[in-house]
């Protein structure tokens, strides 16, 4: 699963979709 990543979002465990 991916975490929600808007432009310039904070880094997440998984790659952004």
Curated annotation (Swiss-Prot):
This protein's domain notes: The cysteine framework is III (CC-C-C-CC). This peptide has a cysteine scaffold similar to the M superfamily of conotoxins, but it displays a disulfide pattern previously unknown in native cone snail peptides.
Tissue: Expressed by the venom duct.
Cellular component annotations (GO), alphabetically ordered: extracellular region
Name under which the protein is recorded: Turripeptide ubi3a
Cellular compartments annotated: Secreted
Lineage: superkingdom: Eukaryota
Gene Ontology molecular-function annotations: toxin activity
Residues bearing the modification 4-hydroxyproline: 4, 6
Disulfide bonds: 2-12, 3-17, 5-16
UniProt keyword terms in alphabetical order: Amidation, Disulfide bond, Hydroxylation, Neurotoxin, Secreted, Toxin
Residues recorded with modification Cysteine amide: 17
Function: Elicits excitatory activity in two subsets of the mouse dorsal root ganglion neurons; the medium diameter isolectin B4-expressing neurons and the small diameter CGRP-expressing neurons. Displays low inhibition of the human alpha-9-alpha-10 nAChR (IC(50)=10.2 uM). In vivo, intracranial injection into mice causes strong tremors and impaired locomotion for around 3 hours after administration.
């Amino acid at each position: 699963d991916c975490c929600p990543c808007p432009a310039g979002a904070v880094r997440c465990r998984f790659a952004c979709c």
